[in-house]
Amino acid sequence: AGFDKNAEVYNALFRLGFGFVEVGTITPLKQYGNSKPRVFRLVEEEALINRLGFNNHGAKTVLDRIKSNKKLGLLGINVGPNKDSDNRLNDYLIGLRAFHEVADYITINISSPNTENLRNFHEESKLQELLTSILKEKNDLKSNVPIVVKISPDIDENQINLISEILLENEI
């Protein structure tokens, strides 16, 4: 996720030989993302800083694009909430509803430091509430699409262990 934010080049990536491609992060509504500049290169550290902020065309546009371009391989769809959403949990459910029939898996993105308070979903009670809602919606949709949860790369080992336990308890 992050390279093909709007599902515009996933088949070209498959033709290059990738075994799977993940598009997104896709939010329910189109969103510009953070103000530019939002990508910074640190030459001496050989690193990049990304402050994109889930810029994307929105679920409907991306879904229409995927439906009109038959995928040539395993396609994951990374979903997240709109920056100004009043109900972020519901935004994830909107993403699941939109993409469960066209995705080979759906990634629930709770990792972005660029979306205020998104990392609150790393907390035990909030993560459990999110997963319970996702699994209930998946059951209501009679969907078998696998769920992946993208967590932050800079959390400590205790948080990783706690999140891992919750994911395993929920069979994710």
Residue ranges with predicted function:
Residues A1-I172:
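Flavin-dependent oxidoreductase catalytic cores
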